[in-house]
Amino acid sequence: MRFEGTDSYVATPDLMLAVNAAITLQRPLLIKGEPGTGKTMLAEEVAGALGIPLLQWHIKSTTKAQQGLYEYDAVSRLRDSQLGDEKVKDISNYIVKGVLWQAFEQGRPSVILIDEVDKADIEFPNDLLRELDRMEFHVYETRQTIRADVRPIVIITSNNEKELPDAFLRRCFFHYIKFPDKETMRRIVDVHFPRLKQDLLREAMEVFFELREVPGMKKKPSTSELIDCLKLLVAEDIPPEALRSKDRKTVVPPLAGALLKNEQDVHLFERLVFMARHNR
């Protein structure tokens, strides 16, 4: 079982190598990189390319590791017992299977996405060490042990909001998705806009990469934001020359909102555009 990329996702050779290394080693693949570099989409593409199910677990600040295994709905059972419902006699009626349980009982290969693991409490990764290592866990309420007959491919993403525990890192294969260079970015854009006018793409790309290099930029625009910007330019039929117009009044209104996401960067962008145009 090897991942060779897909037509809808530009995977660099080193990224494909990382995916296949994790599969060979039977270890979780920990993916880091700037927001918008395709970390989450990678799991979807791996599952699609290999023709296997994808089970997604999107982590929040309140997420607990137990939720990935199962949850026992004691409140519903208490309510049903008060109503005299017969199903209270079978405690399994109140067990809600988590993503890991669902993957373990597939009986065939699958992909588990644990998305943005760094959003959770610092102990969250450690609480999953045994389960991800042994691919099994115990259900105390029913006295079952749930084991994976076929080991799933586990892809874990992180935006580096907090450091992950060393014990967790030792059990993962790590890959950092570098921000795409101009050539790779063109390939990514071609996937989304195969018939885009090259002069418009060239101007938009220049503005995009210039913005990323501006000193003092609080949040650099990402790949997904470039795609949004191009969608707006195409939808509004904006000519390429409008991106370089010396008339400040013709600055494309959607452009700043697609690429820049806070007022400090917007004001910085406006000042730089104004100065650059009047120095030409």
Tell where the protein language model's regions lie, with residue ranges.
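C-terminal regulatory/interaction module of P-loop NTP-utilizing enzymes
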Residues: 1-280
